[in-house]
Amino acid sequence: MAIGVPRPLALEKPQSVDLAQAARYFGAHGEPDAATLALLQKCAVPLLAAAMPRAVWLLADTPALTEAGLLPGEDVHKHLAGCGQAILLAVTLGPGVDAQIRRAGVGDIAAGVASDALGSALAEQAADAAEAQLRQWAATEGKYLTRRFSPGYGDWDIAVQPLVAAALDTVRKAGLCVTDTNLMTPRKSVTALLGVSDHPVKGQLAGCGHCVLRTRCEYRKRGKTCASE
């Protein structure tokens, strides 16, 4: 059973980095103080200049993804309930962002951490932009999409990353590789799955019970969840 053909998705670089989101990744609680905001603003300029967003996606029947071993666990199937098809998506900011994060951290640990947080925020913005394009495509096809669901959510183990990358041919299509330990390079990259249906669907968040970050989650420490942010 064939999976879909990977297709590139043209992304424009965001005009700015979401500093509020970056501040949360940086560890700020509530509104960042003036010093934190100034540091983020300073580090955002070279980081944004270094970004070269690329994306690739494919459409496949959910049975084909299951047969290919791409959908292990229960939570991802709950997310895809009512969806006969699904989209696999990969987005990366490119190696320049990783290099800029390393440069920023030389002799200035705070700048390195701030740049890392900014990179995470910018990667999410790029993923949001890619998702917005896919939603436009779905609307023209009379289809409905769930929210994004990424490896590592619930019991959808990150060990699936190499299979996702292979299905999307990310090395050739986006310059995105996966290491032997299932980490993505460039680091500031996002992979995700969205359910596709002919009727409105939302998908189901996995919740905290199975999440691999549940013991060290900053949101849970503040009595919140990532879904509430």
Where are these regions (language model features)?
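Active-site helix-to-loop segments that bind/position phosphate- or nucleotide-bearing substrates
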Residues: 1-112
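Short terminal or interdomain "cap/linker" segment that borders an active site or interface and mediates
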Residues: 141-219
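Conserved active-site and cofactor/substrate-binding residues in soluble primary-metabolism enzymes
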Residues: 35-38, 42, 121, 125, ...
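Short cysteine/histidine-rich metal-coordination sites, predominantly Zn2+-binding motifs
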Residues: 224-229
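Metal/cofactor-centered catalytic core regions of large enzymes
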Residues: 74-78, 215-216, 220
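Long, amphipathic alpha-helical coupling/dimerization segments that relay conformational signals between
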Residues: 105-158
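Generic secondary-structure signature for well-ordered alpha-helical cores
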Residues: 45, 49-52, 135, 139, ...
